[in-house]
């Protein structure tokens, strides 16, 4: 292993050209005070900058914690942030209240669904191995897949998220899109080559990821509540159950591990650190790849709909904005800086949106064509 502190540039992976713009988006706007803070925290999370201030890590960890969320909820109940939330909801209205506007945008176009898993189809829980989706949510997703090409795009290992979802007719993109596989079960939406789709742009990093996983298992044994998860093409270090007093120590451990692997980078999700290859591949790239696999790379008659709750989903939201083509929906109860156009508060609202979409499609097909 090398001990260099050299920053390795991300390796670009060729992608199909973007489709022509269809739906012009207004420029994304942050909730008041969010953008400046985000830039500051990102500077602290930038491994290439050497992470000089561990306080930046801890602040970012605290910002994504349930305690922080509860405090925000308490402030909201007291009316302290009502104006801020109202302004945010104007910019990112509920996808349920604007449902007719969303389906109107799909006129003459093929809807393609992209769904995150944790926090979108399943609740956020302390133990990531217990993040089960309900049977009713599974039925809703199955119904959606009967009408629209549907993909699950998750930071989890592809095999693991399939064990949770258990629907063979879907596309699955695990490890933030670095492990993509087509449906194991044919449907009327799948192209002939769909079942053969298998894309793993970071295969060469697998031995390195395995080494980091095994090393962090040992290094984090001194941190009660820390959980290290091997997601095949990335390593996740969960701190949801770690005492806040130990966050700084945990961040130091993870940072120290990365010094031995300059070809890996560090990102952060909801109460989790994620160690990934430095290739330029993320959920946004996965979305583009899947559209190409479905035959929609250069089409103007497609409407991608992406629903997710995590900061890693922002890469997909950004792609939709750049294309000027598609609908990004953020799942969050609180105002966040986002590139999504619409919002839903929780998985229950996601399920309601999916069921309404299925019913709308069913009625549209039954309606006579004059």
Curated annotation (Swiss-Prot):
Cofactor(s) of this protein: a divalent metal cation
Enzyme class: hydrolase
Pathway(s) this gene product operates in, as recorded in its UniProt entry: Glycan biosynthesis; trehalose biosynthesis
Transmembrane regions: none
Keyword terms of this UniProt record: Hydrolase, Stress response
GO terms of biological process kind: trehalose biosynthetic process
Domain of life according to the entry: Eukaryota
Pfam families: Trehalose_PPase
Coiled coil regions, renumbered to chain: none
InterPro entries according to UniProt: HAD-like_sf, HAD-SF_hydro_IIB, HAD_sf, OTSB-like, Trehalose_PPase
Catalytic activity annotation: alpha,alpha-trehalose 6-phosphate + H2O = alpha,alpha-trehalose + phosphate
Similarity comment: family membership: Belongs to the trehalose phosphatase family.
Functional description taken from the UniProt entry: Removes the phosphate from trehalose 6-phosphate to produce free trehalose. Trehalose accumulation in plant may improve abiotic stress tolerance.
Protein name: Probable trehalose-phosphate phosphatase 6
UniProt organism field: Oryza sativa subsp. japonica (Rice)
